[in-house]
């Protein structure tokens, strides 16, 4: 990361978008994204290309802007306060790349025409095809049909939801983006509405859809079999894996090479449980897994400011938020002998504030020999997420960890603070 930021005004200021909704999202998010790109040493041409793609293909997907009193048009718990997206820095070997994600929202979301906000993701992917005409649609089309509720089946389904907050808890779809050498899209599907409509368990629907995918899934069979085995505990009351949602990559010339990820969630926050998740309840005990586990444990304690003498079988102090807990995933790669585990450390729910999270990350970077990141991270965080008048416009939400080829991959996810709607609202 860099020592100082250039003036980003030329690329983001004075840009006029087609309507007030898109203008709001651009004015709120483009300055943050631009500062992140500069901070991460993207070339000027790359910055321009990414911001252009963001303006033309991502900004429209955010949908209607918040109301004049700040209420989001479509509320979802992709962040703790319904902000419909995140931005992130991915750190690996002292290098930094920029990514972002959001919940595509169609203008009719929440109406009888689109009660569960399912149409936004389909519309956005079709729009992105204009920029990436070689993007293979096979897997997207398959999972869309498997996981999205058909229009004729949505009638009366909302009345069957098990809890009042179900619309916010079930993020039916989300899109993630990285940008180099060309934009690549990651699609997330949570099929709980479809499972409710079919009267089956959500995880059973996910496994059935994956197993019925056919030839594209054959090269993942070893890892799939292992994960499905984890649906049964090794001992009474032990850890089991039941997928909550999935994601997969889309891009040009990726017909059968898209990574597939299966996500789980737990409200248990003791280290011993995290260890079970990372090792598939000790089904994985190879040397690389053990090395990764040791590095994860160090980051877990540093990011959450956990004392060294904390009981590994004791949960963290409880957080009252409805979605508090730990998300994790298993990445499947072709012909791999084992899945790659990723743990999302929930610093917003269980951490001690941005200052302590920064302190923990800096200590972790130092321990990995990432000296440049250790030196610049606090300064760059403030530079990216502060306005000229000193207001902070972002906070840490999660820190993810995975371990590949004997190296850690760490991603810091941030919730951007949007500009006050009343400052941009056009009546």
Swiss-Prot record:
Record-linked InterPro entries = Aro_prenylTrfase, Aro_prenylTrfase_DMATS, DMATS-type_fun
Its UniProt pathway annotation is: Secondary metabolite biosynthesis
Binding-site positions, L-tryptophan: 77-78
What function is annotated for this protein?
Indole diterpene prenyltransferase; part of the gene cluster that mediates the biosynthesis of the indole diterpenes penitrems. The geranylgeranyl diphosphate (GGPP) synthase penG catalyzes the first step in penitrem biosynthesis via conversion of farnesyl pyrophosphate and isopentyl pyrophosphate into geranylgeranyl pyrophosphate (GGPP). Condensation of indole-3-glycerol phosphate with GGPP by the prenyl transferase penC then forms 3-geranylgeranylindole (3-GGI).
Q: Which GO terms describe its biological process?
A: alkaloid metabolic process
Q: Which domain of life is it from?
A: Eukaryota
PANTHER family given for it? INDOLE PRENYLTRANSFERASE TDIB-RELATED (PTHR40627), PRENYLTRANSFERASE ASQH2-RELATED (PTHR40627:SF3)
Q: Which Pfam families match?
A: Trp_DMAT
Q: Where does substrate bind?
A: 99, 186, 188, 259, 261, 263, 344, 409, 413
User: Might you give the EC number(s) for this enzyme?
Assistant: 2.5.1.-
What are the alphabetically sorted keywords of the record?
Answer: Transferase
CDD domains in the cross-refs: PT-DMATS_CymD
The Swiss-Prot or TrEMBL record describes its family as follows: Belongs to the tryptophan dimethylallyltransferase family.
Q: A single GO molecular function, which one?
A: transferase activity, transferring alkyl or aryl (other than methyl) groups
Q: What is this protein called?
A: Indole diterpene prenyltransferase penD
